[in-house]
């Protein structure tokens, strides 16, 4: 505990890091406050039915968790950051097929800014479609007509659509500000803080269910909590696991007027088992909202079957498709975020090489092969943890709301984002000659 307090003191001593953390916390507070600001013209006291449906888990429960309860509150942030996530998925997928986007991806910082601008405009377009669907869907989700104080006419719909679109744009801006001026990935942090906000209520519901209904009592609650920490530990191991590729560097020495190369020190290239982080989970989850939403627009028997299959997040078909999407997106996102050819070129320029592998293209091919080999078990493990809530609901019979945190999207996002943020703080400490946050807080001599 003493070392931990000393580490916090060292964090506070670094002015830039301190300011970034304060800014990040301030922005997160603003986002959480906005999640409780109800849309004008809606009586918040009559949203009980909507709250009950989202508290019960299911697809609405996940959506509500991603928005930090804003969906159930009919707040100005009801759409959350998901339209931005959807836009990012579309832009990255289009980058495979559209030469213009491929060109932008290779232009460095200027290309990245242009891609971000395209993503923002696409986010607005998605919001314009989703906002009216959300407003008209409130009635179908159990919100009575009396809750709409201004009625459901255009005098309510048009201003509310503008507010919802503005809310998502503002949330997107908050996330980008955290990324640029704060600490951590802003968009991921907004999702994480929303998930954490609904965690206590889900646990309380599980606790009350076990105790009041004589359904296992405190002993079963204790076992569930212990197993929950085991799953968290497994998730941390997945996020942190790496394969070390040994690299040697040649150095020149002069002997009798002649220069010769000798082997220098051995170093390693760390290739992460899960190099794509939590993005495959977020992307896959965003896509899983689509089938049920589209099927809900039709009253045909086929559409109803699709809606039933993909509306049950603990069902067989939902989890099979979800796991498959996670595996696909893990490979896809790893290919984007791990430029093995660039790593090989950088290694060649610095005089490094992998024993038995020619520098340059062969090294790039070798690194790509290794990444493909380690990504497969990593993606399977990621998919297994993602569908774990469905498994524990079927076997253990825990509350669906609590099950969402028993592995699955929610837990993986919390663990992944927390570790990523801690690593950024860690780098600041190491750069200022302090031991990292992962170890101690002692000043280095």
Language-model regions, residue ranges each:
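N-terminal cationic and glycine-rich segments that engage phosphates or anionic surfaces
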Residues: 1-105, 110-445
